[in-house]
Amino acid sequence: MGRIIGIDLGTTNSCVSIMEGNTPRVIENSEGARTTPSIVAYQEDGEVLVGASAKRQAVTNAKNTLYAIKRLIGRKFTEKEVQKDINLMPYKIAAADNGDAWVEVRGKQISAQQVSADILRKMKKTAEDYLGEPVTEAVITVPAYFNDAQRQATKDAGRIAGLEVKRIINEPTAAALAFGLDKQEKGDRKIAVYDLGGGTFDISIIEIADVDGEKQFEVLSTNGDTFLGGEDFDQRIIDYIIAEFKKEQGVDLSKDVLALQRLKEAAEKAKIELSNSAQTDINLPYITADASGPKHLNIKLSRAKLEALVEELLERTLAPCRTAIKDAGVSVGDIHDVILVGGQTRMPKVQEMVKALFGKEPRKDVNPDEAVAVGAAIQGQVLSGDRTDVLLLDVTPLSLGIETMGGVMTKMIKKNTTIPTKFAQTFSTAEDNQPAVTIKVFQGEREIASGNKALGEFNLEGIPPAARGTPQIEVSFDIDANGILHVGAKDKGTGKENKITIKANSGLSEAEIQQMVKDAELHSADDKKKVEFVQAKNNAEAMVHSVRKSLGEYGDKLEVGEKEKIETAIKDMEEALKGDDKDAIEAKNTALMEASQKLGEKMYADMQSSQAAGAEAAAGGAGAEQAHAKPADDNVVDAEVKEVKKG
């Protein structure tokens, strides 16, 4: 069995980790960074850039550079959160045939799952480069408050990326694993994980207990907001800058895609700077131009102003915290430790607010950017059987139920129920001689079904004619360890049954996923070809440079025919380099190597004779040098001497 990697698939940044023995290791990507921006750019020539390279070209390719895609995954186009993002994002969000929110790049619609798969593929490659072996299995994290559709969509993204997703694990739970595993305190400890990331907010109350030498992590409650995070904080700064610039210059930057992309970068930078300083300058020369000429933007932003701009966003995190504490059946005083996760928690005001709410200083010994990936890697080690001293008991974040008479939501599994879990209840028909029942499945806390998230529906047919209330229909709910729901209905009288795995009333079909997996494999093959072509081209260009240089130095020692042969081979090679045929380039490279063989022989012979002459001169001059040797302080050369320590 290969290694199971842990991936934190974040809204703003992603991170990958593995276990080396019992020590977690966060893996640096090809740029040497421990986190990778969750940004994907689609180039005109079909190349896909992921991470820092995609971020660098965002200003000049805004419409085809996708970020914060996690906010769309598993969502319908008509959802109010998606509609809000349509007006804010420089890229186009479109409705897919199944009603999902997809994106449009270079005239082609692609799903949020495919974009997420590109990010996951980069994480997979990062791990493979480090381990030197293929990676096929992963534990991927999601916000605790993700619903069933969002979890399923994340799992699908993993499959498209060529990963078997062994487990979907909640981000706060993963962070608790990373925090609690090496703690030696005896007795049960209750911790609160406050997770404010790039696009989502979660709060979980978790109990860590020692049970016969085994660390047990039991989630008591969870709550949150899947559309609240650092991206919203950035947007508040952007809106403020736009308003200020309009006041000063009379120009509205909100319609300028290029300017917006520069503003986004500047807003994120300013926000980070204000975590360490009281004031920052936002300086963007040539931000736009009008009839009077170019316009420059220079605005001062203080920490106090930023706090005022985002006050309402910070307030929005408090209600879920209070609900989670209440649902866990604990008081604030019962909580031993508060852990901060997610880059946005570096903001001093967030830390102040959390301290005020929980009455204690948040822990500083948890890396908010890496803890989630580390926890996922620990869970991967547990699932692979390499670790047996950890037990994780997670919960379902929202209640699950079915629609019954009058549009009422009848809850089958209540929120914060430990998973995996099963529950069955018997229902009957609403009308005489009813031949079939439609089971409509919902997720949420509202009493009326239509106010909750519709997850899917199916029919149980062939019910024998009978008076209303007579048939006995058993509906069963089964949530697996990934938090994904399977629903069944059975007519107790006839034994007829029907089952579905909830894939939301949209999501990707199996055929679509298979097609996307194939496309991804093709893409991978294309990428490999591209890399091979670039390598062949680089080798050829280096060869041309080297031969040309040698020809300049030793060409006069060659016969005319030999020299012409080399020059012809160089011309042929330069012609081949103008095209994109790898085989032709390699063939011309071989021809050039053969043609320049005589040149190499001349160079070698010349070097040999030079060395021999040098050796003779050195031997002849040694005696004379010794005879004249005497101290000559005025000829001393100052030099730096370094001690080379061995071992």
From Swiss-Prot:
Residues modified to Phosphothreonine: 200
| Keyword Ribosomal protein assigned | no
Induction summary: By stress conditions e.g. heat shock.
Q: Where is this region: Disordered?
A: 607-647
Q: Which Gene3D superfamilies match?
A: 1.20.1270.10, 3.30.420.40, Actin, Chain A, domain 4, Substrate Binding Domain Of DNAk, Chain A, domain 1
Give start-end positions of Basic and acidic residues composition bias: 627-647
Under the heading PROSITE patterns, the entry gives: HSP70_1 (PS00297), HSP70_2 (PS00329), HSP70_3 (PS01036)
Q: Does the keyword Calcium apply?
A: no
Q: Which GO terms describe its molecular function?
A: ATP binding; ATP-dependent protein folding chaperone; unfolded protein binding
Sorted keywords for this record are: ATP-binding, Chaperone, Nucleotide-binding, Phosphoprotein, Stress response
The record's listing under PANTHER family reads: HEAT SHOCK PROTEIN 70KDA
Q: Which family does it belong to?
A: Belongs to the heat shock protein 70 family.
Say what the protein does. Acts as a chaperone.
Q: Report what the protein is called.
A: Chaperone protein DnaK
The species this protein was found in: Polaromonas sp. (strain JS666 / ATCC BAA-500)
